[in-house]
Amino acid sequence: MKTSELRQKFLKFFETKGHTVVRSSSLVPHDDPTLLFTNAGMNQFKDVFLGFDKRPYSRATTAQKCVRAGGKHNDLENVGYTARHHTFFEMMGNFSFGDYFKRDAIHFAWEFLTSPEWLNIPKDKLLATVYAEDDEAYNIWLNEIGMPSERIVRIGDNKGAKYASDNFWQMGDTGPCGPCSEIFYDHGKEIWGGIPGSPEEDGDRWIEIWNCVFMQFNRDEQGNMNPLPKPSVDTGMGLERMAAVMQHVHSNYEIDLFQDLLKAVARETGAPFSMEEPSLKVIADHIRSCSFLIADGVLPSNEGRGYVLRRIIRRAVRHGYKLGQSKPFFHKLVADLVQEMGGAYPELKEKQAQIEEALKNEESRFAQTLETGMALLENALAKGGKTLGGEIIFKLYDTYGFPYDLTADICRERNIEPDEAGFEREMEAQRARARAAQSFKANAQLPYDGQDTEFKGYSERQTESKVLALYKDGEQVVELNEGDSGAVVIDFTPFYAESGGQVGDVGYIFAGENRFEVRDTQKIKAAVFGQFGVQTSGRLKVGDSITAKVDDEIRNANMRNHSATHLMHKALRDVLGGHVEQKGSLVTAESTRFDISHPQAVTAEEIAEVERRVNEAILANVAVNAAIMSMEDAQKTDAMMLFGEKYGDEVRVLQMGGFSTELCGGTHVSRTGDIGLFKIISEGGIAAGVRRIEAITGLNALKWAQEQERLVKDIIAETKAQTEKDVLAKIQAGAAHAKALEKELARAKAELAVHAGAKLLDDAKDLGAAKLVAAQIEADAAALRETVTDLTGKSDNAVILLAAVNEGKVSLCAGVSKALTGKVKAGDLVKFAAEQVGGKGGGRPDLAQAGGTDADKLPEMLASAEGWLCQKLS
C-alpha cells in the first residue's frame, strides 16, 4: 500500500464514522506563542479542547503537517542516523470534542488496523499499553477487544512524579490532562528490543504506531484532578511509521515516498545510492521540512522560525558537500517532492517556484563561506584533542554562517565533543554588546480585569463615554494629573487600536475643561483598548464622564492609505501573479508600506501598471462596503485572506466594487474616490523572496509629484538644457567627458603602481617552491590588476597578493605564475583574503580580484598569506 493510499484510507475510514475531514493547519501556529511550529495534530484544536473555541462539528479527522526542529521538540541531530527521526512528518488523527470517549476511540483504532476491509494487520502483531490506574481502558482492551492480558501493559508513573508517565498526557502544569493508551507493532524477533516497560524497551522491535489520549481531567493549581464535564479524545497515528508497517519494511526511509526522494538526492549529488548513507537520508528528510515551511510563509533569516529553517537548509547543503556536491543542488529536489506530495498538499504545487527560489538563494549564500569555513574547522579538528573550543564554534557561526548544530554534527562524526558551554558564553558576550548598543522600547502588558471596550469608530468619530481605568508607569492609578504620561481605558471608544498593520488612532479625551491627548491606541487585551498619551491640562479620574474625539485629519489619511493598500494588493496579484501574498504591512497617515512574497524585483513597467490599475479604481469612485458574515459565506465571496491566518466564526468582509474583496477589521474610506491619488515611491528587497513597496496617497502624492517637478526644473537649470528633452543628452555628454578623464587618471595611476610593484618583486619572500609578495600599495582596482599581471609575467614561481584602500573600501588582487596554478590558485587565495576583510570575490586560477569593507584587518590578513601558501605547497 502506497503512502498516499494509506493517507486517504485513514481519512475515509473516519469519515464513515461521522468525522468531518479538516484540512491540515499551517506549520506556523497562529495565536499560540508557546509553539515554534505545529508539531501535533491537536495543535489546531487546542482552543476547542480548552473551551475557548467552538466548531460546527464534534468529531474531526486530519492529516496534519508537523515539524520538530528547534525548541523543546528537536529531532535534528538524530535525523538521517535512525530509522524514524524526521524534521517533517505527517500525523494522522481523529478527535472527539465531548462526543465519544474511550470505548469508541479504542474500537475505531482496532477496526481500522485489523479489519480486512481496511489495513488487515495481524492481531498477534499488536500490543497495547494503558496508564496503570486506567482500569476502564484496560478492561475495554481485555473484555471487548479480546486482547490477551500478557499483551496489555500497564505503565505507571515512570518519570519521577505522580502522573509523570509515558501514558499520562498533560497540556501544562494545569489544565486538561488524562491517561492515554498506545498501540505498538512488532517488527519481528530478528530485531533487538523488548515490550514497553521492559529494560529493552528502547530497542526497535516494538514500535508505537497509535496513541489515544483521553482528556478526562482538569488539573487545578493545587494539583487536584477534577473530572471534565465533557471528556474528549485526541489520537495520533504517524503516517510514515504506519506506511513502513504496511510495506513490510523496518525503516521509514524504506517506504515508497522516501525511496523516490533518496534516488533524487543521489541523482542531484552524484553520490551512489545506498541505504547505508546517512547523508542521503538527511537531505531527503530536510527537503520536506524546508519546502513545506517556505510554502507556509517561513523564509530563511537570523531569528525565530526563519533561523530554524536556515539551520535545516545549511545542514542539508553541508551533507551534499560531504557527498562531493559543491554546487547548488538542494532546490532541484523540490520538483521531485511536488511529484510525491503535491496531490495531497496543493500548496506545494502553487508555491513551487517560490520554494525553489528561496532555497537556491540560501544555498548560494552559504556556498560563499562553506568551503573556507570547512577549511578552518578541519584545521582546528586536525590539531587533536577531545573537545572543539567554543571560540572556534562561535567564529564559524558568526563569520561563516555555520549554525551550532551543523558544527556539532561534524564533531560527532569525528568523536570530538563540541564545547557548547563555551559557545554559549561567546554568544552571550555578543548579546551583551548588542544590548549595550541598543535601546529598547518597553511594551508593557497593563493589568486589567474589568469590562471590555466597545469600539464605535466605524460609524462615530466622537463618543460619550466613561473612564474605566487609568495607568501611569505601567501601574493602575485612580487619577492622572497635568503633565502625567499614561493610558486610559474607556467603555465606548471611537479610537481604532493598532491592528492588521494600521496604526492606532490619535485625538483627545475631554472631561469638561480637562484634556488628555491621545498619541496612540493599542489593545491591552483582545477586546480592551488602551488610549496612550499625556494629560495636557487638568486631571482625569476613574469614573469621569468624558468625550472621546478622534483627530479627523489623521484618521482620514489612515483610511486613504489603508483602502489604497487593498487596491494595491489586488493589483499586485493581477500584475505579478497569484503567488503574491501579503507578508506584512504598516499603514500610517504618511504612507502605506506593504511587504509581499515575490522572487525578484518588481520592474518599472510592472510598478507603472499597478499604479494605473489602482488609480483607475480610484477614478471609478465606487462605494466601499463592509459586512459581517460567517466564514463560510465570506469564502463564497472569494474574499482575499491571509494564508494560514486564524479567523473567527464571523469575519468582516470589505468590498470595493469589483476591484477588491478582502477580510479586514480596519477603517476605510466611504468611496474609492476619497483616496484622491496613488503613487508608489519605492520598491526593494528585505529578505529572500520578500519585496517591500511603499506608496502614498492624496495630498501627499500631489506634494511628491510637485517636488519631482521642481527637481527636474533644477536639473534643467544646472545643466543649461533648453528643454526637459535636452536634459538627458546634457547629462550623458557630461558623464562621457568625466569617464574619459577617469580613464586618463587610471592610466597614470597604473603606470605609477607598476613602477612601485617592480621593487616588490625584488623584496619577495622566498619559500622555496614559490616567491610570495603580499603588500598594500597606492592604487585603484584597475591599477592593482595591471600591477599583479605585470609581476606574475616577470617570474615563473610568483604568488602575488596586493591590496589597496580607496574611500574606505578594500580592493584585493591575487596572481599566480602559470607554472604554479596546479598547486596554488589565485581564486582560492583572494577568497581566503577577502573573507578576513569583510568581503568576497574570485576569478581565474592565475588572476582573481575581490573587495572588502574592513581596512583595519589588512595587516593581519597580509601576514596570514604566508601560512596559507605554505599549507598549499606542502
UniProtKB/Swiss-Prot annotation:
| Recorded GO CC terms | cytosol
What family name appears in the similarity comment?
A: Belongs to the class-II aminoacyl-tRNA synthetase family.
Q: Which CDD domains match?
A: AlaRS_core
Recorded GO MF terms:
alanine-tRNA ligase activity; aminoacyl-tRNA deacylase activity; ATP binding; tRNA binding; zinc ion binding
Question: Which cell locations does it reside in?
Answer: Cytoplasm
Could you tell me which SUPFAM superfamilies the record lists for this protein?
Class II aaRS and biotin synthetases (SSF55681), Putative anticodon-binding domain of alanyl-tRNA synthetase (AlaRS) (SSF101353), ThrRS/AlaRS common domain (SSF55186), Translation proteins (SSF50447)
Reactions that this protein is recorded to catalyse: tRNA(Ala) + L-alanine + ATP = L-alanyl-tRNA(Ala) + AMP + diphosphate
> Which keywords, in A-to-Z order, does the entry hold?
Aminoacyl-tRNA synthetase, ATP-binding, Cytoplasm, Ligase, Metal-binding, Nucleotide-binding, Protein biosynthesis, RNA-binding, tRNA-binding, Zinc
In this chain, Zn(2+) is annotated as bound at H562, H566, C664, H668
- Name its GO BP terms in alphabetical order: alanyl-tRNA aminoacylation; negative regulation of DNA-templated transcription
Protein EC: 6.1.1.7
Per the record, the domain comment is: Consists of three domains; the N-terminal catalytic domain, the editing domain and the C-terminal C-Ala domain. The editing domain removes incorrectly charged amino acids, while the C-Ala domain, along with tRNA(Ala), serves as a bridge to cooperatively bring together the editing and aminoacylation centers thus stimulating deacylation of misacylated tRNAs.
Q: Does the keyword Aminoacyl-tRNA synthetase apply?
A: yes
The note describing how and how many cofactors are bound reads: Binds 1 zinc ion per subunit.
Q: Gene3D superfamilies under this entry? A: 2.40.30.130, 3.10.310.40, 3.30.54.20, Bira Bifunctional Protein, Domain 2, Threonyl-trna Synthetase, Chain A, domain 2
Give the protein name, as stated in the record.
Alanine--tRNA ligase
The protein's required cofactor(s) are namely: Zn(2+)
Q: Does the keyword Ion transport apply?
A: no
- According to its UniProt entry, what is the function of this protein? Catalyzes the attachment of alanine to tRNA(Ala) in a two-step reaction: alanine is first activated by ATP to form Ala-AMP and then transferred to the acceptor end of tRNA(Ala). Also edits incorrectly charged Ser-tRNA(Ala) and Gly-tRNA(Ala) via its editing domain.
